Design a protein with these regions (language model features):
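Extended polybasic, low-complexity segments that bind anionic RNA or targeting/receptor surfaces
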Residues: 1-46, 91-207
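Glycine/serine-rich anion-binding loops at beta->alpha junctions
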Residues: 54-91
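Short, structured surface segments that line ligand/substrate-binding pockets
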Residues: 46-49, 55
Length: 207
């Protein structure tokens, strides 16, 4: 079982915690991680982009000049793609970019992402993450003390508006709850900062 030290918000070590070998000590499957990140990003796309083809642009119903005798190239409409104000040839149309992943693969991807953070030493367990009021300074001080000044994902056992809003204005910092963590956010963060209570919740729900 992986053993990780526990620190307080001042960065001082206050103990250690044994993590689930299934969740935090799994073999990292890079192929599944790639598939999970790709699915996550593709599923964020709305797919509503659209352009007008020659049949959808207004006007152009009349042949601009007669077929023969003018010396000019034959044209059937002023809305052909080669014309100014003409329709778009092969332009984007609305489509569904959604990619499905089965539950087992999602679970393997999550285990791999969490295990990769532990292996790299980028998982930081804090005994308790809390703020007395909306204090960005408190969160900034904590992140600096524990060595997570840059991109950090803070995971809580439940929604805490004081913590969420205190961290909201810190660049590169995202706050979430244990049951909404995803592979992309975990891998995108330099440090995975999680409270001791949130670790217990993760092991309870995802084991």
């Amino acid at each position: 079982m992986p053993n990780v030290k526990v620190v307080n918000m001042a960065g001082a070590e206050v103990g250690s915690i044994e993590l689930s070998d299934v969740i935090f000590g799994a073999e990292v499957n890079e192929a599944v991680l790639h598939a999970a990140v790709r699915a996550f990003l593709m599923n964020q796309r709305q797919g509503t982009q659209s352009t007008l083809t020659r049949s959808e642009v207004s006007g152009g119903g009349r042949k601009p000049w007669r077929q023969k005798g003018t010396g000019r190239a034959r044209q059937g409409s002023t809305r052909s793609p080669q014309w100014t104000h003409g329709g778009i040839a092969l332009g984007p149309k609305p489509r569904d970019y959604h990619i499905d992943m089965n539950k087992k693969t999602k679970r393997v991807a999550l285990y791999s992402a969490l295990s990769a953070k532990v292996a790299a030493g980028d998982l930081i367990v804090v005994d308790d993450i809390k703020c007395e009021g909306y204090k960005t300074k408190t969160m900034t001080a904590m992140l600096s003390a524990i060595g997570a000044e840059k991109k950090a994902l803070i995971v809580l056992p439940e929604v805490d508006s004081f913590v969420v809003k205190s961290a909201a204005n810190i660049p590169g910092v995202k706050t979430t709850v244990y049951n909404t963590i995803n592979v992309y956010d975990i891998l995108n963060a330099d440090k995975f900062v999680v409270s001791k209570a949130a670790i217990a919740k993760i092991e309870e729900v995802f084991a």
